[in-house]
Amino acid sequence: MAAEEPYRGFEQGPIRPPSERDSLLVRVTRNCPWNRCTFCGLYKGERFSRRPVAHVLRDIDAVRRAVDRLTVAPAVAASPMADEGEWLAEHAARTWLQAGCRSVFLQDSNSLIIPPGDLETILLHLRASFPSVARVTSYARSQTVARIAD
C-alpha cells in the first residue's frame, strides 16, 4: 500500500479558462488523464493524479481563513505570511473577493473523473464554507461524464 502523499499547501493549476477569470480555482486533479489532444501541449510529459480529498478540503479552508483575514481583520492581513501556501491562498482569496465570491472552477482538466462521493464531499464543503457561491464549473470529457453511475 502506497503511503499517502503529504499536504504541501494550497495549490492552483497552470490553466484558467478566460471565462473563469472571476472564479476561485480549486485544484481537484493534477494534469490531464487523456493528454492526447494535438492542440494542447500544456500537460505533455506530466503524470495525471487525483489530489486527496483531504488536501482539497484543506485548500478550501485556507481560502476561507484568508477571506476572513481580509474582510474581518484587514490590519492583520497586512502582516507577513507564514509560508508560500498561505500566501497563495490569500492571493486567490483577494482576487476572488474583488470578483464577488460567486463562482468556483474545479481544476485541472477532467475533474469529474474523481469518484462522485468525493466530488459531493468537496462541493458540500465549498457550500458550507462559502454560501455565496452560485456556480461551480469544471472541464470534463464527455466520455468521463457518460461513465458516471447514478
What name fits each language-model region?
Residues P18-V76:
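Canonical Radical SAM [4Fe-4S] cluster-binding loop centered on the CxxxCxxC motif
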Residues Y7-F10, F39, F48, L70, ...:
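Phenylalanine-focused residue identity feature
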Residues M1-S23:
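Short, charged low-complexity linear segments at domain edges
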Residues R65-D150:
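Conserved SAM/AdoMet-binding glycine-rich loop
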